[in-house]
Amino acid sequence: MLNNHQKHAKGGRFNRWSGNLWLTIDFSEKSYNTLLTVGNTLPSRQYYYKEGITYSASGRGGYAFRYLPKNHVFDVGGSSMFLIREDVKLMYVLAFLNSSLGFYIADSLNPTANIQVGDLKKVPFVLPDEDTQNEVGQYAQQNVDLTNSLLKYKPNEPIFENTAIEEYNNNKSWIDILHSFIQDYIGIKALILNNEAIINNKIFKIFDLSEQDKTLVVKKQGIKIGNEPVTKQAATAFIDKFNNQLLNGTIEHIFYIYIYIIHGTTTLPLKIKNWNTTSDHCVKICSIIISND
């Protein structure tokens, strides 16, 4: 029965701040008793259903730490951590772990692509006062919320609400719908990147890094794009070029951008021979493709 199934964190593709909570696991009495005697025998069951942080231990994009809401279980594929002190703020910890300094330290402790629980236990941690934790944590919370605002368009996510095409459909042509969604998507991604840059700078300050130390971190982890200076002329040129691509791009080009955002790939499960199709037919095609994610 469905009410015997619990939401299950099991890692997945690189995804920072939130997401990858697609699965459920049979936790009926019979199944639970079986799990107690086979496999890893549920050694961390006392932490099930608690709020925490989950992460992918390995992946092509590197480590990715995400907020774990209450009422979830987890296993080694979606390793998780939980607070044991009331004076430590969860969002501050999430911000630190997703900072360049956090990655730099983790990489130094384990240079492979597979970070272990033991590695994280060795990471030095500076706990500032409550106000500073809240100040830094607010940017992590914003990034969780912003990420969720995009995940709600993906049918495989438990927080799915509606397809982007249906959400943005105010008697517009379907290509205008895609234009609006892609512009909003890029805007939200830019806000996330900007928040990550702010978090980075604040973590550097909290850990009292010297300029030499900062240089070492940046040299290995790269500079956050939100810290890169942008001249007014460059910003204007980019916006003009981007809008020109959206307004004058082929139907196929715009469609592929949308599919990449929602589906994560441009490899489509079907061939489209006629791009000069009707709006209704294109909406159906989009629905078929994203439902196959």
Language-model regions, residue ranges each:
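Polyanion-binding catalytic cores of nucleic-acid enzymes and NTP/SAM-utilizing transferases
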Residues: 1-83, 141, 149, 185, ...
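Amphipathic, alpha-helical segments enriched in basic
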Residues: 2, 30, 49, 56, ...
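Non-catalytic, well-ordered alpha-helical scaffold segments
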Residues: 3, 52, 90-95, 201
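Residues that form generic nucleotide/phosphate-binding pockets
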Residues: 8, 96, 104, 108, ...
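Basic, amphipathic alpha-helical recognition segments used for DNA target recognition
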Residues: 46, 56-122, 129-146
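Noncatalytic linker/hinge segments flanking ATPase motor cores
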Residues: 50, 97, 120-123, 163-168
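Non-catalytic DNA-recognition/assembly elements of restriction-modification systems
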Residues: 126-293
